[in-house]
Amino acid sequence: MIDTVTLPPSMPELHAIVAMASNRVIGRDGKLPWHLPEDLKFFKRTTLGHPILMGRNTYESIGRPLPGRKNVVLSSTMPATEGLDVIRDVTEVAQVCQGAEKVFVIGGARLFADLLPLCSQLYLTWIDEPYEGDVLLPPFEHLFEQIDTLSSGEGYEFRLYRRKV
């Protein structure tokens, strides 16, 4: 777990964004276990123009830097890569994202486990059925309260959560 005391005061606000099936699954074999174009559009619309922070496995599953966003990868083993800011410690986010109002944490599970307690908001695509998978979203309900359902469609909702005070 990351110690909140070590975060610099200049740290941008952290927001998390993730899609989760009803059984907490968020991934399978390095991919999303569902095909939901509306979720991909929501992700793009929400994160465009903002830095995104991810772990190495998440970056490797995407396979390339996402356009229109500063891509930051937190990894102790990944070498410097063109088009990315590779950092070794979460406190480096303040430096590489200097001037950013917020940074979106986009995964994976280990990064969510470490950083959800530090996030002020969570954008969750709730998928109203279980999926088989090998990556689960850690429990967050004790940290956040739902404040809005931004929109919904058949079998899914885009929910906004705020960290409990």
Language model regions located:
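Flexible, gly/pro- and Lys/Arg-enriched active-site loops
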Residues: L14-P51, R56-V165
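Short, low-complexity, intrinsically disordered N-terminal peptides in bacterial proteins
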Residues: M1-E13, K164-V165
